[in-house]
Structure formats: C-alpha cells, structure tokens
Amino acid sequence: MDKINAVITGVGGYVPEDVLTNEDISKMVDTTDEWIMTRVGIKERRILKGEGVGLSYMGIRAVKQLLEKTNLNPEEVEVVLTATTTPDHHFPTTSSIIAYHTGCKNAMTFDMQGACAGFLYALETGANYIRSGRYKKVVVVSGDKMTSITDYQDRSTCPLFGDACGAVLLEPTTEEFGVLDTILRTDGVGYPHLIMKSGGSAYPPSHETVDNREHFVYQDGRVVFKYAVSYMADVAAEIAEKNGLTHDDIAWIVPHQANLRIIDATAKRLGVDMDKVMINIQKYGNTSAGTIPICLWEWENQLKKGDNLILAAFGAGFTWGAVYLKWGYDGKKA
C-alpha cells in the first residue's frame, strides 16, 4: 500500500477590521512608536470588537471562506480541530461552535492548546488523522483573540498582541507533498515565564485574582526572548538538516510572528535571505496560534506546487517546533 501523506489543499483566514496603532497604544501606556518598532517590529494590530464576540467569530469566517475556495460540501468534513489559547468558553469547545455555524455537522470536533506553537501541534495532529487512512477531510482552525487577555495597563505586553484566525484543509495524497516532517518540543521549565496566572483550576477566578490583574498575559520578556531566539532558530535548522535542505532548496520560511529580531535570527541560522521569509508582524502583531496560518493565507497566491516551506514557532510552556511542508498546489487565493 502506498504511503499516505497529508497535504494542505486550501487556506482560509480572517483578520478583524478595527486597527489599533502604536500611536493609540502610546496614549494608554508610556511607550512610543519608535520603541515598539525597534524592539519588536510591530506598527499596528487588528482587534476584534463587540460584546460576546470570541474566537469562534473569526474561526467561522475563516472556515466558511476555506469551504468556498475549495468547493467543499461542509457535510464531507470529518474532523474540525481548533488550536487556541483563547477559546470562547472553557466548555464547550470552540470547534463545536465553529462546526455548527459552518454546517460541518458530520465532523468530530475538539480543541488543542499549544500557545503560540499551536498551529504546528494542530497541523501534525490533523495530519496524523489523514495518515491513519480513516479520514479524508480534516479542517485545522488556528487563531486567537489575544486582546481578550491583554492588559492595556502593562506597557511590556500590550503593544505585542492582536487578533486573527486561519484555517487549512488537509486531504490525503500518495505523492510527496504536504506535511513531510515535524519536530515538536516542550520544556516545562518555561511555564512560569509566560502564563495567565489565574482563571484555571489551580487559581479559579475570585475578586482577588481580578483585582491583581491575573487574568491577563504575564511575560518575563527577557527570559522568553532568550529561549525563543535560540530554540526557534535551532529547530528550524534541525528539520532542514534532517531532510537535506539547503538554503537554496527552501522557497519560504514561515515563522511565528512574535518579534522581528527572532524572525531575523531564524532566517540567518538557515542562511536564507529575508525576501524568502513571510513577515506580516508589522500589520498584525502577535496573534499567537493565528500567525502562521495567516501568513499562509496572505502568501497563498505566491506559493507554487512543490515549494519547500519551513514553518517554525515558539510559545508558552515552553513549546516550540518546526514543520517541513511541501506545498501541494499553485496559488489560488480568492
């Protein structure tokens, strides 16, 4: 029997219309456009406004677009899985809400939480469903409404985050396309350094936790940067070397968009020019699990069948990883 690979056959995406600029941020906290651009490379970010509007709002729109672009009957979708740190609710799953509103009524659904590396974890999980031979249509949704857990009184974190969500369709192929290799790593030593301290079962919500602003992102920026800048570059180089890929073989690097300096370090480690690196951090900021699928969505019309892509990410946990992806079709962005 021929080996089954899981190939991406379509990409959908959604970014909110409302823009929050560095000038807007500078009116909230003591910072400047120059400082934010120099430190992280972000000019503006998108924010999802509206009461009762969560990640599913963006996920539904990304999936509807994906289904339309791939001419797929939603009732044919067998799995909908969502990678996010900011679900609509602790329960039910955001995937169940997305599946319901997109007509994927025959799909099993579940959520995953891999922080900023969430898309890589979800992509490998979805690919394994395809590789099993039991599933033919798997939708991977990945994104975050980071503004819902961003403290706009904290000058060290509030300039960093935005909202976005992407979705990809995975299907089987016996050709050498798709998710060809994956490396995923975790080191729990990092958990105290990038965390939402309260709201879970360890520290349930209380007046005290709310007063202490413990329901927002906390980050020890220096520690996180030190690990991220080396781990993300190292794992990207490792997967390229493991698969015999030189800088000439790599069509695109698709990095998590957390910090322009980390992206630059990853490109340099691979010996790849920056014009072969997908960068949109200046427009959207760090959308956590949304960054990589939104890059694929924005660059889809530039991708060619057979292009070698290296996806790399680093996030809370610490979690990090890389995926070697051989693109399966010529760009057809709607």
Swiss-Prot record:
GO terms for cellular component: cytoplasm. It holds the Pfam family ACP_syn_III. Its main location: cytoplasm. It is an enzyme of class 2 (transferase). One of its GO terms (biological process) is secondary metabolite biosynthetic process. Pathway: Lipid metabolism; fatty acid biosynthesis. Residues 257-261 are annotated as: ACP-binding. It comes from the Bacteria. Belongs to the thiolase-like superfamily. FabH family. Catalyzes the condensation reaction of fatty acid synthesis by the addition to an acyl acceptor of two carbons from malonyl-ACP. Catalyzes the first condensation reaction which initiates fatty acid synthesis and may therefore play a role in governing the total rate of fatty acid production. Possesses both acetoacetyl-ACP synthase and acetyl transacylase activities. Its substrate specificity determines the biosynthesis of branched-chain and/or straight-chain of fatty acids. This is Beta-ketoacyl-[acyl-carrier-protein] synthase III. It comes from Parabacteroides distasonis (strain ATCC 8503 / DSM 20701 / CIP 104284 / JCM 5825 / NCTC 11152). The gene is fabH.
